């Protein structure tokens, strides 16, 4: 049967499944640790890249160990991102035996697409969104006070900005999942496009606290492009 659980070559006992989980977990942790070591060996270069959007700002260490613990956070976050392809691969290999052929055809491409879109969102945020937001806060009130920032608070802001943009790039994944589960369809999504335009505009204004309408329009158009691209995918699959 086409929808039957994976064929005999994919069947596993409970013990084998637990052993597989242990092995995949170990390999994922090793990949993460190696990535963190690589990041820690290049921490000065990475910190310079993080500071790049805030050229001219003087950073302070406001408490003992602030820079040290922030450096650890940097190696952890970037280590996760760097090792994410291997971690995604381990997840996919682990879940395959428990999926039907139909579920495999749906879930595996979604996981791969989700990872690619997340990384694309991080890159988009670093190149376009974060620099604009940082410059806005630098220039706001600069005639009244001198901008001297805590490096920890700055890094937390950068992470929030990047991950907010990356999560917004997951919109197509949610749409395709909802469409595949028959919760909503492409016609329903298309019927509310006006509300989506307004929502994306508001979202862009929140994510980019800048008076520059061009960058807000840029992000809004990117979100709308992802939204309508997902509708097209659902239409192609008649969902």
Swiss-Prot record:
* Subcellular location(s) per record: Plastid, Chloroplast membrane
InterPro entries noted in UniProt: Sec-indep_translocase_CS, TatC
Topology class, membrane: Multi-pass membrane protein
Pfam families recorded: TatC
Q: What are its GO biological-process terms?
A: intracellular protein transmembrane transport; protein transport by the Tat complex
One annotated Gene Ontology cellular component of this protein: TAT protein transport complex
This protein's source sits in the domain of life called Eukaryota
Q: Which UniProt keywords apply?
A: Chloroplast, Membrane, Plastid, Transmembrane, Transmembrane helix
Offer an example of a GO molecular function term for this protein. Answer: proton motive force dependent protein transmembrane transporter activity
Residues crossing the lipid bilayer are 30-50, 76-96, 107-127, 157-177, 188-208, 214-234
NCBIfam families per the record?
Answer: tatC
The entry assigns this protein to a family as follows: Belongs to the TatC family.
Name this protein carries in UniProt: Uncharacterized tatC-like protein ycf43
């Amino acid at each position: 049967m086409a929808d039957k659980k994976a064929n005999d070559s994919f069947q596993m006992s409970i013990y084998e499944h637990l052993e597989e989980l242990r092995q995949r977990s170990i390999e994922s942790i090793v990949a993460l640790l190696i990535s963190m070591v690589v990041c820690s060996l290049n921490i000065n270069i990475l910190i310079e890249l993080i500071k790049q959007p805030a050229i001219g700002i003087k950073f302070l260490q406001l408490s003992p160990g602030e820079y040290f613990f922030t450096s650890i956070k940097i190696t952890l976050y970037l280590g996760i991102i760097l090792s994410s392809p291997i971690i995604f691969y381990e997840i996919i290999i682990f879940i395959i035996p428990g999926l039907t052929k139909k579920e495999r055809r749906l879930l595996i491409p979604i996981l791969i697409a989700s990872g690619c879109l997340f990384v694309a969102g991080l890159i988009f945020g670093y190149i376009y969104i974060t620099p604009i937001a940082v410059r806005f806060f630098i220039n706001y009130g600069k005639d009244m006070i001198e901008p001297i920032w805590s490096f920890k608070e700055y890094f937390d802001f950068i992470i929030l900005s990047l991950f907010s943009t990356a999560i917004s790039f997951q919109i197509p994944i949610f749409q395709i999942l909802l469409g595949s589960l028959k919760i909503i369809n492409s016609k329903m999504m298309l019927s509310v496009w006006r509300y989506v335009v307004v929502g994306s505009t508001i979202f862009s204004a929140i994510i980019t606290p800048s008076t520059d309408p061009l960058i807000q329009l840029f992000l809004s158009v990117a979100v709308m492009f992802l939204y309508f691209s997902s509708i097209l995918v659902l239409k192609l699959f008649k969902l």
